[in-house]
Amino acid sequence: MQYQVDTHTHTVASTHAYSTIHDYLAVAKQKGILLFATTDHGPAMADAPHFWHFVNLRVLPRMVDGVGILRGIEANIKNIDGEIDFFGDYLKQLDIVLAGFHEPVYPPSDKATHTEAMINTIKSGKVDIITHPGNPAYPIDIDAVARAAAEYGVALEINNSSFEVSRKGSEANCTAIAKAAKEFGTILVMGSDSHVAFSLGGFERALAIIDAAGYPKSQLLNRSPSVLLGFLAQRGHHTVADLQALFDEAV
């Protein structure tokens, strides 16, 4: 199966990444990616873009040469209460909201604290996808998180970058997450977590984990633009309606 959607990418606006939106569009055309989300790090990260970057994402075209662009953020989970570093009505302007633990913002603590923080983030209703929940630096109660995500309709990410250049040792946790997701009916999504355009749509390692766990690939959000856009619309992102209309016209 060709997976046509990538929900997790970073641009030069996060200065430890190396590609522009234009770069991603070119690679998307080459790889058959029909929809990707630009999700730079939230403002609490030291080298993250300014708050205005996210407010002004509305200037991005909806579609360029058949490739759709989702306006998003990878926010930072800030504390045990599940608060993130983006807020209020500005969240409603975004098409997609990712959030995860990042050491410069929320240093690792203990399993119980990580679990409570992640579940509170899930319950907040502000976040659509939890990024790299298999990070071994942040052990969690996987079953508890998977159950909460299933209950609140939040997706858990299997992060391809975690098996290549970041978060070494994530394989066992991610396999357990995929197995728990299968058991509890939790939505999974693969994210490239691309920091350079060449890795856009790179899901090979994540897909191997999902296969090994026996999670049904027919339930992955990456299957098509309509699947992801339907998920986002159901979660209250009315901003995606015009993008869905463009894909409908292209059929």
Curated annotation (Swiss-Prot):
Its EC number is 3.1.3.-. Zn(2+) 2 binds at H16, H41, H195. This is Probable phosphatase Sputcn32_1369. It is an enzyme of class 3 (hydrolase). Its cofactor is Zn(2+). GO terms for cellular component: cytosol. It comes from Shewanella putrefaciens (strain CN-32 / ATCC BAA-453). Pfam families: PHP. Belongs to the PHP family. Keywords: Hydrolase, Metal-binding, Zinc. InterPro entries: Phosphatase_YcdX_put, PHP_dom, PHP_phosphatase, Pol/His_phosphatase_N, Pol/histidinol_Pase-like. The lineage of its organism: Bacteria, Pseudomonadati, Pseudomonadota, Gammaproteobacteria, Alteromonadales. GO terms for biological process: bacterial-type flagellum-dependent swarming motility. CDD domains: PHP_HisPPase_Ycdx_like. GO terms for molecular function: phosphatase activity; zinc ion binding. Zn(2+) 3 binds at E74, H102, H132. NCBIfam families: PRK09248.1. Zn(2+) 1 binds at H8, H10, E74, D193. The keyword Protein biosynthesis does not apply. Binds 3 Zn(2+) ions per subunit.
